[in-house]
Amino acid sequence: MSLNRRQFVASSVALATTASASRLAYTATDKELDVIVIGAGLSGLESALTLEENGLRVRVLEGRNRVGGRVYSLFDVPGNPEVGGNTIANAYGRCIAAANRSGVEVVNLAPRLFGSRLGQEFFLGGERVDTRAWETHPRNPFQGEMRQKLPWTWSDAMFQKHLPFTDLENWHDPKHAKHDISVHDFLTAHGATNEMIDLGFNTNIAYGTTAYDVSLLQQAFSDYWQKVNRGAIMAFSRTGASNAPAGNTPVAQATTPGVPPGLLVGVFKGGNQRLPMAMAARLKGDLLLNQTVVAIDTTPGSASVTTADGRVHRAKAVVCSMPFSTLRNVAITPLPEPTQHKAIHTLGYIPITQFHLVAKRPFWENDGLSPGMWTDGPLGLVLPQRFGARDDEITSLTVWCRGLNGLYVDRFGVEAGKQLVLSEFARLRPASKGQLEVAATHSWTTDPFSAGDWAIFKPGQVTELRAALAKPHQRLFFCGEHTSVGSRGMEGALESAERVSLEVLTSL
């Protein structure tokens, strides 16, 4: 199927909103390509655009029937909530610049979120806990001054108090190799019990599956990125739970009480997926969707990519933005050197499953509680989305099931998983019974093109594997958020695109 650029833009919107089409491509005449880019997420698209701007002929292959990768907006759910790629902050300079280049408006949510400080409810063992009484609660496992910490703030406090080095920007430096241990070992060395770790780290985990499979250096990297953005997202915590709300770009003015001057909690107008869609529309070369890559062959002077339909795409070089969780299922010939091969096959990824619910009526007004919740059960985190016409309008609720909870919920399948979520809501919040509909659900773990959400370094992997992640393999080059070293998330994806573009331009 061949479309011109105007038709491509229109079709991209249709695909994102209806997912009714199976293939999309706008093709140039068949000629020798300079570069094939695998993946139409932020890193792949930015790499392709940069290489085209430098005169190279590029083709982008994407396995899904949409662009964006893990930047995924639900255009058919009120408010267009995000499944992945949630917000940007002041330190997301590359994202802001990419939006400016592509004509995508950045909206600052800080005034709205700080003006709606409803907090969140705390449910433990199926019972609501008054956060004001948590310090003396019989199920509080923490000790000493840490008993004052709510579960979603405990691990942050432990890391801030006990991290053994302060130059967090050098988290990957070999001099810190002795700290490439599990978070579990680190916390127990500082007096934490398994009960503390289970509640304060493993529940609604942000990195990994449990504290056993996350490196302390991974936490240092995450803490560094938090430190960079702390002035932008004051209430961000490792779990994603809020002690207060969140925010967006043009920087916030101090017109709303409690909003720090200059605060940005940014989203892209109409849904964050609008950014990769606009970037894709700027491409000059081919963008082929529904192209599942099964093999990559590389030599010192050329490379080729084979897709599941049997087609072989040839070019002088290949840029691969696939997460290692899916790249490990692709035949690479010749094999990468042993350390890189091991990284491809063992790098960790966090399990995350989301349910997006729409309320028929605002049941939280009936029970007098906040719609947001932090639970130790199947609901995990419940985050209200405020993308309506009014600042106080809640357009949907997002249920975040992370780590072991995400794996547990996935075992039910989609339909039974929906019923599990609705029944758990009704159990904890009786006023919600019959008032909620599951508008969408997505498991990043069972998604064949992601097999997990963001990358996680396991204990020992920073020391052994990190330096090999993005090492060029003949004419095969690597990018993606998992290869970034100075930033994370959407900004990390664009950081990796800068690096890989320079590598390719230097080699050709």
Feature map (PLM): residue ranges:
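FAD-dinucleotide binding site
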Residues: 4-508
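Flexible coil/turn residues that form the inter-helical turn or adjacent wing/linker of helix-turn-helix
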Residues: 1
